[in-house]
Amino acid sequence: MREKLTKSDVEKIQAEIDHRKLVERKELIEAVKEARSHGDLSENFEYHAAKKEKNRNESRIRYLERMLKTAIIVEDH
């Protein structure tokens, strides 16, 4: 189902996408690198947690981008 969004909604969603891409993505990549440097990945909880959080961020970006791509823009009330 296509979401009905106002221009304000679109701006908020785009701001979240930008923040996730420009800020959170970089921080999460660094967290993965840092955790990876701690050695054995098979028992490295920090590494697996960092990867999971990075993947969650990427999933949210894809979801929001898809929402914007398919949205129906309505007038602000």
Predicted regions and their residues:
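N-terminal cationic and glycine-rich segments that engage phosphates or anionic surfaces
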Residues: 1-18, 22-56, 61
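Amphipathic alpha-helical coiled-coil segments
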Residues: 58-72
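Glycine/charge-rich, flexible interdomain linkers and switch-proximal surface loops
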Residues: 44, 71-77
